Amino acid sequence: MTVLLDSNIIIYAAQPEHADLRCFIEQHDPAVSAISVVEVLGFHRLSDDERTHFEEFFTASRILAVSDLVISEAVSLRQQRKMTLGDALIGATALTDNLILVTRNVDDFGWIAGLRVLDPFAST
């Protein structure tokens, strides 16, 4: 099953105590949105070690670009309900690419018709 990893899942997976999450990710066919690259690497307080880890992760990842279709879908989502730009673009990417969105923030996305959302912490 191909999944789209939300930014929070990428961050949690880097923490030593989340070995089960890393195993979950390895068992699926993960992709990430280009928005997650900006959200994770753009965090101003990353240590050098954290930055290196995430850069290596993204280098090895399948990164999905923000297409015109994704932009159109994100606009539609934001017109329906207040949500962050990042969440709108990530949700729209999952919708347009027909991917399961893996996130810990189910409430931020659960209202979106047709979007499949999975919280790996709830299933472990």
Placement of each model-derived feature along the sequence:
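Short, well-structured N-terminal submotif of metal-dependent ribonuclease cores
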Residues: 1-32, 42-55, 123-124
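Short loop->beta-strand "edge-of-pocket" segments that line small-molecule binding or catalytic clefts
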Residues: 3, 29-32, 60, 64, ...
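Short, structured coil segments at secondary-structure junctions
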Residues: 26, 57-59, 112-113
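Alpha-helix capping/helix-boundary segments
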Residues: 9-10, 36, 70, 89-90, ...
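Acidic, PIN/NYN-like endoribonuclease modules and their adjacent C-terminal/linker elements
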Residues: 91, 95-124
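Acidic catalytic patch
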Residues: 59-80
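Donor nucleotide-sugar recognition loop
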Residues: 80-86
